[in-house]
Regions:
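Membrane-interface micro-motifs in multi-pass membrane enzymes
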Residues: 18, 22, 46, 69-116, ...
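Transmembrane helices and adjacent periplasmic/lumenal helix-loop junctions
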Residues: 89-92, 110-149, 169-182
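Membrane-interfacial interhelical loops
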Residues: 2-32, 81-82, 86-88, 174-205
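Membrane-interface helix-boundary motifs at transmembrane edges
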Residues: 58-69, 110-116, 147-161
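Alpha-helical transmembrane segments
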Residues: 1, 70-80, 119-126, 162-173
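Loop-to-helix entry region of an early transmembrane alpha helix in multi-pass inner-membrane enzymes
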Residues: 36-51
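Solenoid-like repeat scaffolds
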Residues: 34-35, 129
């Protein structure tokens, strides 16, 4: 992919990327993609990112009480992603965005206070959308599942329903609000701008 881009170390290039949702993930990914010129370096970068993703997946699984016997299952999302990234039009931005989303989920899991978690969601969800793009839906889904389970344990079903609607509407509202400032169709704001080179023809993972 490095032959299709020209990474520039100047402020204009930075602002060109950062003013769109997912721009930070795009910027980091494009910086790393430069090193694909050396095949061994590109392979090492991808391997390192995949290992980080797997560790984050397992950390979140352990937070939900997963037994060690399920450790091999933590590789399944990475294998699926590895397969998808075999497409030359799949961009490294997706991997970086997933790392940002899973990192945000891990930091959320470390919060203890109720109001700390509420403030974190209100601030981080839109911030994550702007930096990582539509991968913020992963963080949104994680929060909903985790809080719903906590409310069910406390026999507070309707509290879980409230979290579902509140967090869900806030997460969906982020790309809708972004559409007021950036000139992209809704389907691209909802699906990620820089994850695939030709977004109108994203293939099925087969």
């Amino acid at each position: 992919q490095e032959q299709f881009q020209l990474f520039l170390f100047d402020a204009d290039y930075w602002w060109e990327r950062i003013v769109v949702p997912g721009g930070l993930a795009d910027y980091i990914a494009e910086y790393l993609t430069q090193f694909y010129y050396h095949v061994w370096a590109g392979a090492c970068i991808l391997a390192f990112l995949y290992v980080l993703l797997q560790r984050l997946v397992w950390k979140l699984a352990k937070e939900q009480g997963a037994a060690d016997v399920y450790y091999p299952l933590s590789f399944l999302p990475i294998i699926v992603l590895w397969h998808f990234m075999g497409d030359e039009n799949a961009m490294l931005s997706l991997v970086v965005a997933l790392l940002l989303a899973l990192s945000a989920s891990c930091w959320y899991a470390d919060l203890k206070g109720k109001w700390q978690r509420v403030a974190y969601i209100l601030i981080v969800l839109p911030l994550l959308y702007w930096t990582a793009g539509a991968a913020h839906f992963i963080f949104m889904g994680w929060v909903i599942v985790r809080e719903f389970r906590l409310n069910l344990k406390g026999k507070n079903f309707w509290g879980g329903v409230g979290v579902f609607w509140g967090v869900g509407l806030w997460g969906i509202g982020c790309p809708l609000l972004a559409s007021m400032w950036v000139q992209f169709p809704i389907y691209r704001l909802m699906g990620g701008i820089g994850y695939y080179r030709f977004p109108a023809v994203i293939p099925w993972i087969e």
